[in-house]
Amino acid sequence: MLMLLVRGTHYESLRSKVVLPTPLGGRGTEALVSECPSPDTGIRWRQSDEALRVNVGGVRRLLSARALARFPGTRLGRLQAAASEEQARRLCDDYDAAAREFYFDRHPGFFLGLLHFYRTGHLHVLDELCVFAFGQEADYWGLGENALAACCRARYLERRLSQPRAWDEDSDTPSSVDPCPDEISDVQRELARYGAARCGRLRRRLWLTMENPGYSLPSKLFSCVSISVVLASIAAMCIHSLPEYQAREAAAAVAAVAAGRSPEGVRDDPVLRRLEYFCIAWFSFEVSSRLLLAPSTRNFFCHPLNLIDIVSVLPFYLTLLAGVALGDQGGTGGKELGHLGKVVQVFRLMRIFRVLKLARHSTGLRSLGATLKHSYREVGILLLYLAVGVSVFSGVAYTAEKEEDVGFNTIPACWWWGTVSMTTVGYGDVVPVTVAGKLAASGCILGGILVVALPITIIFNKFSHFYRRQKALEAAVRNSNHQEFEDLLSSVDGVSEASLETSRETSQEGRSADLETQAPSEPPHPQMY
């Protein structure tokens, strides 16, 4: 243990550093211990043996210089060894020069445990703090894992490892099912944009009605109508593929071509065509309304659900543009009509993406999208495992079955068999007949079970996490009082970004009041440690 402060002793000008052990918060720190002035610098701003008066969250205590000198690498030890007031201010949140008191806006309960650490040299875990908050406090005060008492160290490490972390490995924020405060801040920031907009209150109500099904009764009705239109569009697309509709439309198309007319006007059944036009009109109304009511146009085009809405109506308008383009060229021959038919078929195939519009009204689909977004590493590992297994077992099967003429003619042809075998699908269209081939197939199936099961468990756990989190958000909206929500909306009327910054500054004014008034629960004079 370094003894940097000795009563009545002068040091030469030096600047020493103490490398602290790995803090409980998980980051390594290199702490500046002291800057002792040279003998000719004059009188110090405070005596080296003067007791340190601190105020941590309203708890006032006096700490002796000798107790702090035992642990010079901690924040209070460095504060005691500070060579100037400017250096000391960098270590605390505020300083009252008249009372010579240092203020820290930290957890007062942890500070009481910190006082016990300065007396005994051991830090005990507080049950009132979660392991992550405890680690952050310990990191702030400059305590390492070695400071933990032996009776609490194993329990602390076990609790820290058992707590779920954020699914995004790039984030340091602990995982939680509860709504994140940042999400609430983002919503308030978006709603604040309506304060300076024209007809902002009306636009805000319409936006919330279209975006939040649980906001009001009209929003629930709008959601039901939107879901019904999506299901009707999908049903019409499925009915259009039935054989009786295909035969009737093919005959009408042949008759139209023979008469020198475009077959596109007669291919669709009149009822299905009218239903398609109605669905397109509704989808177009949804997209345009959301675009006009959105608080931010840039954020609108960055949202995945809005992109799905655009893709759901894009094929219809592209088909119209293709027909107009060929019509302007005056092409009525079979070649131009054939090209138009291929373009229309491709665009009609894109209508299948309309099923993704249900994600706006489905908690499970949104949770699935969030799971895939945060599981790209696991999905990549799964594909890598499958690729390696398919390549190995396909080569073995080709070697064993190439002479039997049962479909294993080339290694690329064996890839299909290896894929359906490793995924335990087993279509049975290609099967091995030799003993060596059957052994290879058995190994392929068993390897597929083991390989697929490993990352699937992690992905399923992430899906469960995001699903519970999404349900918690929806429950918070449903169970909240409607009048309270209206008060929240009214509070952001006329609010700008500058006013939000002003409110943050105002919220910090209470810190100086703590320095002037003493908490009623505290004794008249700080206790000495």
Swiss-Prot record:
Name of the featured protein: Delayed-rectifier potassium channel regulatory subunit KCNS1
Domain remark from Swiss-Prot or TrEMBL: The transmembrane segment S4 functions as a voltage-sensor and is characterized by a series of positively charged amino acids at every third position. Channel opening and closing is effected by a conformation change that affects the position and orientation of the voltage-sensor paddle formed by S3 and S4 within the membrane. A transmembrane electric field that is positive inside would push the positively charged S4 segment outwards, thereby opening the pore, while a field that is negative inside would pull the S4 segment inwards and close the pore.
Motif (Selectivity filter): 424-429
The keyword Transport appears for this protein: yes
Subunit and interaction comment: Heterotetramer with KCNB1. Heterotetramer with KCNB2. Does not form homomultimers.
InterPro entries per record: BTB/POZ_dom (IPR000210), Ion_trans_dom (IPR005821), K_chnl_volt-dep_Kv (IPR003968), K_chnl_volt-dep_Kv5/Kv9 (IPR003971), SKP1/BTB/POZ_sf (IPR011333), T1-type_BTB (IPR003131), VG_K_chnl (IPR028325), Volt_channel_dom_sf (IPR027359)
Biased segments, Basic and acidic residues type: 502-514
Gene behind this protein: KCNS1
UniProt keyword Plastid present: no
